Each structure stands twice: as structure tokens, then as C-alpha cells.
């Protein structure tokens, strides 16, 4: 619903109702599907909390602990941080939309649009470091827009979100690219002559202390591990197109509408919009550069996809509803498929083994695993397979 009618329909009360209903849906999905291997890994780590871990910061693990105490060792408890992160994204959309010149309608439409994408609908009920980092990224985007508009206190909000986002997942560093336009926006550049940005920077650095404490205790294995993931191959555009295409896939047909909305926004020259475009594109820019050297995981671009929901809410075009409805239908079908497969995966695999010509038997896992960045894990498992076993 757009235009004057949509603005009248989306009252604050309906906005809160939307958030409540979406959170309920996320909770039902979370409680109804078995946890994955990654989620079990996070659960196991949360039973022995530490400053950080070898391959991840620990914020998502810490947040899991009170829910496990309250709800027991259940899928809902394990996934509660993801449910809360999705709610936080919705809550942050409203002040961000207002900063960009919109109101409740834009925030509500953007949040609804995200539910027409597989990565958000499923990711809101699946605990991961990505969804938590994305919530902090949206908060940091709001702060950057406010800074660009002359709000100096927003540096503290940016520092809080950047620091805690880094404690959620290391790719949060992409948000620093969003600070670049502040160098040529007069109101923002003037703030650099005051102590506030620099003190806020020290505050953000202090919030990341758990990562450095763990690293100092373990010969910096967590940092060295991240540097070891940088590909050493020659330059190629192959993986850039693969990364961008995979992000379109994660957003289903709704992603086509996102791309058109980005194009339509190019004429916005207000300081807030200039800053918003930069911070929204930052993850895609950074990891597309990484993709020049090798494969990167598609979901690292998730903050760009989430903020693209707002981009489309502000810049609808003829035919955008058809694209998003088609994307929503595809996402709903995928959700049903997830329910069917996860109810009894052992039986599904057993049937595939007895029917060599079945679709499942013809599916190649290597393309999927490369898209999400688990090639080494799959190769290790494949080397240990016995005859007739599947990865």
C-alpha cells in the first residue's frame, strides 16, 4: 500500500501490531524446525562462555544464555537472539525512515518487503552471527545518517553499534566505509574538529575488547584465522559476479525490485541520503573487492539487502508490487519446503538412495557450499565418506 492511502493506513498502532505478528511468526518457525549443525555448535559454545572463540566473536553466544535458562534447552531458546535481532531491525527502521524524510509507512513497507525474501524470513528464525551483526549495522546506518544531518551526539550511537556489531561478526568493519561521505558533507566534516568523534571511536574500540583479550590469551589465533581466509588467487571477475548473483538469489525476485529502487534513488542529493547510500552499499562494496581474489560467502552482503528494503519503500516504481509478490510467493514455497525437509531428513535421504534418478540424487552440493563459504569443511567430510554416504 503506497501513496496517501498507505500513509493513512499505517498508524503507529498498526506498526506495533506488524512487529508483534512478525515476531510471533519468527518464534513459531524457530520452535517448529530442528536446529542445524551450526546452531548446535553455537549452543555448545554457549555452555562454556568465553571472551571470544577461535572463529567468531561471542555476543550471540552470550545472548543465548539467559534464554536457555528461561526456556530450557530448546530450539526456541537457541534461536531467541535471532528473533530479537529481527525485531530490533524493525524497531530501528522507524527512526531511520524518519531521518530520511519518511515515517511509519516507509518503515512498515520496508519491513514487510524483507519478509518477501528468503534470507530474512528464514534468517529471522535461525540463530547466526549474521542476523545479529545486521541489526547493529542498521543501527549504525541510522547514526551515520544523523551525523550527516549535523547531529553530533549520534557519534556515540555509531560507536555503540559498531563496537557491538564487531562483537557479533567481524564483517561489521564494512560499516567504516559508510563514514567516507562524512568527509565532504560540511556539517559532518565540521564535527571532526571536536572531541566527540574521537572519544566515540575510543568507546567503540573498548567495546571490542573481548576479541583482543581472547586473542592475546591464544596467540592471536582468532585474528590469524581471519587473515588466513583471504584468498591468494589472481584477480578475476568471476567470483564478483557470483557474489552479486548469489545476493540476488538470497532476496528472490524481490531483489530485482531492490536494484531498480537503488537506480531511482541516484538523484537524491540530501546529506542524509548520500550517507545512507554509502553505508547501505558498504558490505557489497567491501566483499565484492574481496571477491576479486576468490569466493566470498553470499550472506556477508546481508546488511545491504536489509537496507535495500528501505530503499524500495522510498522509491517504488510501476510493477514493484508484482516483483515483490512473486518474490514473496517463492519465499513462502521455500519455507514450506524447509518444513517438509526438516521434519524427517533421514527418510528423505533414504528415499533418494533408492531412487537414483530422483531430483535429490542429481543435486550438486558443491555450488551451494561454495556460495556460503564452507568448501574446506565439505572437502574434509568428503574425504572421510564411506561408500554410499552423502555430504
Predicted regions and their residues:
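Transmembrane-helix signature of polytopic, membrane-embedded enzymes
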Residues: 3-6, 10-12, 93-116, 134-135
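Short helix- or helix-capping micro-motifs
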Residues: 19, 107-115, 162, 166, ...
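Transmembrane-helix motifs of polytopic, lipid-linked glycan transferases
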Residues: 80-101, 139
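Membrane-interface transmembrane helices that cradle and orient dolichyl/undecaprenyl
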Residues: 98-104, 140-155, 261-268, 316
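Short acidic/glycine- and proline-prone juxtamembrane loop motifs at membrane-interface regions
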Residues: 119-133
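Signature aromatic-anchored transmembrane alpha helix within multi-pass, membrane-resident enzymes
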Residues: 317-358
Amino acid at each position: 500500500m503506497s501513496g496517501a492511502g498507505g500513509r493513512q493506513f499505517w498508524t503507529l498502532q498498526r506498526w506495533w501490531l506488524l512487529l508483534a505478528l512478525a515476531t510471533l511468526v519468527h518464534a513459531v518457525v524457530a520452535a517448529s524446525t530442528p536446529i542445524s549443525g551450526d546452531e548446535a555448535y553455537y549452543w555448545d559454545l554457549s555452555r562454556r562462555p568465553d571472551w571470544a572463540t577461535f572463529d567468531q566473536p561471542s555476543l550471540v553466544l552470550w545472548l543465548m544464555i539467559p534464554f536457555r535458562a528461561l526456556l530450557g534447552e530448546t530450539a526456541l531458546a537457541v534461536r531467541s537472539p535471532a528473533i530479537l535481532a529481527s525485531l530490533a531491525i524493525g524497531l530501528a527502521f522507524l527512526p531511520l525512515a524518519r531521518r530520511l524524510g519518511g515515517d511509519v509507512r516507509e518503515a512498515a513497507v520496508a519491513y514487510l518487503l524483507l519478509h518477501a525474501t528468503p534470507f530474512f524470513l528464514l534468517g529471522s528464525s535461525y540463530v547466526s552471527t549474521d542476523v545479529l551483526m545486521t541489526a547493529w549495522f542498521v543501527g549504525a546506518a541510522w547514526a551515520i545518517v544523523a551525523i550527516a544531518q549535523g547531529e553530533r551526539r549520534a557519534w556515540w550511537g555509531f560507536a555503540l553499534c559498531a563496537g557491538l556489531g564487531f562483537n557479533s561478526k567481524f564483517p561489521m568493519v564494512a560499516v567504516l566505509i559508510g563514514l567516507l561521505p562524512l568527509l565532504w558533507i560540511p556539517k559532518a566534516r565540521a564535527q571532526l574538529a571536536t572531541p566527540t568523534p574521537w572519544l566515540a571511536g575510543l568507546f567503540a574500540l573498548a567495546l571490542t575488547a573481548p576479541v583482543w583479550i581472547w586473542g592475546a590469551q591464544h596467540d592471536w589465533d582468532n585474528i590469524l584465522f581471519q587473515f588466513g581466509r583471504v584468498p591468494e588467487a589472481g584477480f578475476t571477475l568471476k567470483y564478483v559476479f557470483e557474489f552479486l548473483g548469489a545476493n540476488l538469489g538470497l532476496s528472490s525476485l524481490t531483489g530485482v525490485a531492490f536494484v531498480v529502487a537503488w537506480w531511482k534513488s541516484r538523484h537524491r542529493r540530501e546529506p542524509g541520503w548520500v550517507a545512507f547510500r554509502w553505508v547501505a552499499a558498504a558490505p557489497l562494496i567491501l566483499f565484492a573487492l574481496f571477491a576479486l581474489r576468490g569466493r566470498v560467502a553470499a550472506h556477508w552482503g546481508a546488511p545491504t539487502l536489509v537496507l535495500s528494503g528501505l530503499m524500495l519503500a522510498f522509491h517504488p516504481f510501476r510493477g514493484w508490487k508484482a516483483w515483490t509478490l512473486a518474490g514473496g510467493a517463492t519465499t513462502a514455497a521455500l519455507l514450506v519446503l524447509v518444513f517438509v525437509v526438516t521434519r524427517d531428513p533421514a527418510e528423505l535421504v533414504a528415499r533418494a538412495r533408492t531412487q537414483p534418478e530422483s531430483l535429490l540424487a542429481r543435486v550438486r552440493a558443491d555450488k551451494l557450499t561454495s556460495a556460503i563459504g564452507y568448501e574446506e569443511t565439505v572437502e574434509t567430510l568428503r574425504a572421510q565418506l564411506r561408500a554410499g554416504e552423502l555430504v
